[in-house]
Amino acid sequence: MYLIFLLFFAASYSMSLSSADSVTIYEDFVQCFKNVTTISDIDLSDVVLPRTSISFTPTLRAYIRNARFNTSSMPKPSIIIVPRVDSHVQAAVICAKTLNLQLKIRSGGHDYDGLSYVSAVTFLVLDLSNFRNITVDLNDGGGSAWVQTGATLGELYYRIWEKSEVHAFPAGVCPTVGVGGHVSGGGYGHMIRKFGLTIDHVVDATIVDANGQIHDRKSMEEDLFWAIRGGGGGSFGVVLAFKVKLVTVPKTVTVFRVDKSVDENALDMVYKWQFVAPRTDPGLFMRVLLSSPTQNKTSTVNTKLRALYLGKADDVVLKMAEEFPELGLKKEDCKEMTWIQSLLWWMNHVDVDKVKPEILLEREPDSAKFLKRKSDYVEKEMTKPELNRLFQKLATLDRTGLVLNPYGGSLNVTAVNATAFPHRHKLYKIQHSVTWPDAGPEAERLYIGNLRTTYNIMTPFVSKNPRSSYLNYRDIDIGVNDHGADGYRKGEIYGRKYFGENFDRLVRVKTAVDPDNFFRNEQSIPTLPPNRR
Ligand code: FDA
């Protein structure tokens, strides 16, 4: 399946734009952009970047987060638009639509398969990295924030922390992830069991539609507001900003980490984890990481459990002694800290007193690793022999891992159609993961092959008909094996995996708000075929 994708891409390189084509596109685009806006020539050179601009390559590379797509042979956009104000975004939409060019929207660039900045067809990139204003208002109900989509999660956490240590926001634990893709695709972090998904806290949004018009929640209609909470960015419009409700957290929270080798009964721990982690106190989130033996270290699977408890260490130690003795949690394993420090700890800073929260503001431009991710949802606990088979196989693979994220708690109380994100009532989610250091097709074949192996092993134990996937763990493979399906039929293949029954409503919304399918990418929501409208 992967080979087909690569061949598809390779063929597309030869069809990629000549520089003459890209000059024509630039000239036509600039003409349109000037007609639609009041931009001066001086400002224009910072906003619309042709391939010949000295800023083109640094701007493109700044938010490429997967090194597989950072090579010279990867197709490049004809133009990068770096808007400064809303009207630039409106003009970008109007002009790209007028010239019939595909517009890729990029906020933080963390799309695992690079859909926000690479494509086999002629395309433009709309880079929202200047859209990073955040306004926190603690007096609005229990606290709220307007956050522009080019901001990072780290910036949002930092701005909240500047005002209050007991206010927080439930979203991902990687601070460089962009708000635009993360929130529109669902979003979760280490408080998911207590507070649900990130989208469960979105109360308003502003969006530029396919006609270049700006809407807020009131004027966009509830259907579209429903769709952009989990239905993914890039299918419905350019989200400019989200308004989110903050949550309150205790002044002291606890984190702990327990690492076990196979000799220390790691298998028993992981087996029992499946029963405890999705059912225990919603204030407790325990993630398990299973990884193949890293070079020169051990010969068995590494098992790491990392946890956040929204409370004191004594309480969680007592709780675990009762519910999860296999963990063997001791007070010495626990660290009490503030919520913002817990984020630093999840970023792998062991001594959080020595790290300043300002580190959350670091965007780490132009830093990318070679990687591939896939996802799964588990509805029924695996047996010990089944887990054992997985452990045995994982021990033979290099650099491959599975991250198990417990669900339950708040996720169970919300209906699966409350937002576009459908996978709420599951036991846990798996992220299949492989990250490697070397460039080149050989390494890619080897490591992605490893990932496929664990994905295949898990087939009997994960959701079926369809096998579900998390949109924010973008996986281009899941739409490839389509036996020639195109348009709506192809969209239905990946669409049902990402959105389950919510796919039908998403298609209806898409057809209503963007009937010409201007906002599209390789895995966007399709419009209904004309004979079904
Ligand atoms: P990017 O800019 O690449 O956009 C992703 C998609 O959204 C693209 O299709 C893009 O077109 C679209 N889009 C972006 N901005 C838009 C806008 N303003 N309007 C409309 N469409 C827009 N997830 C999670 O839930 N919890 C986690 O803890 C993590 N952790 C994590 C760590 C790392 C290192 C990576 C690389 C990824 C994650 N993720 C994650 C996954 C992450 O949530 C997902 O990749 C998001 O889509 C990333 O959003 P960005 O804006 O950074 O990506």
Swiss-Prot record:
GO terms for molecular function: FAD binding; oxidoreductase activity. Glycans are attached at residues 35, 70, 133, 296, 412, 417. The FAD cofactor is bound via a bicovalent 6-S-cysteinyl, 8alpha-N1-histidyl FAD linkage. InterPro entries: BBE, FAD-bd_PCMH, FAD-bd_PCMH-like_sf, FAD-bd_PCMH_sub1, FAD-bd_PCMH_sub2, Oxid_FAD_bind_N. Disulfide bonds join 32-95. PROSITE patterns: FAD_PCMH. Binds 1 FAD per subunit in a bicovalent manner. The keyword Flavoprotein applies. This is Berberine bridge enzyme-like 12. It comes from Arabidopsis thaliana (Mouse-ear cress).
